[in-house]
Amino acid sequence: MSHAGLDPDAPLKIAYLTYRGKPHVGGQGVYTRHLTKALVDLGHTVEVFGGQPYPILDERITLTKLPSLDTFNDYFPGRFPGFWELKTRDDALEMAWFMTGVFPEPRAFSSRAARELTPRAGEFDLVHDNQCLGYGILKIEEKIPTIVTLHHPITKDRELEMSH
């Protein structure tokens, strides 16, 4: 047994977070698909918690959708959500951040993920946060060991998308 109480040879139950899972542009969706498949191939159990656009995953992997206001979708990027779309506290916060010029997706997603994961803390051995880095991740980390992957600043994703 490890100091964390886990058998180092036993497969892990992993909650994998990706606030955007775009399958063909930006890298997060592609990285998510290949990494989670490799983890399952190694014998681990993986559940992906994702925001729009949702990733395309191996059929052995569960996707738990954490819908956002999707203000930066492909068809109408920067759209202004209607008041009827604000159904939760997280929606209201996402809208407030959006109105102040802040890119709201990571922060809002992390809050949604914390609300979803903290009651389920006993179901997972590890959380892998794929570049979200929002404040909600700190809440999750209080209950479940967490690792983070940071690929590059988010401004690079936008530059790449705008150039194509």
Predicted regions and their residues:
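A conserved catalytic-core segment of Leloir-type glycosyltransferases
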Residues: 2-12, 47-117
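Active-site proximal beta-strand in glycosyltransferases
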Residues: 14, 126-129, 140-159
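Short beta-strand/turn micro-motifs composed of small residues
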Residues: 18, 50-52, 150
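A short, glycine/small-residue-rich beta-strand->loop->alpha-helix junction that serves as a flexible
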Residues: 18-33, 102-106
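A short, Lys/Arg-enriched amphipathic alpha-helix followed by its capping loop at the start of a domain
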Residues: 35-44
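Nucleotide-sugar donor phosphate/pyrophosphate-binding loop at the beta->alpha transition
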Residues: 105-112, 144-145, 155-164
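Glycine-rich phosphate-binding loop signature in dinucleotide/nucleotide-binding domains
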Residues: 119-124
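Short, solvent-exposed amphipathic helices
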Residues: 130-134
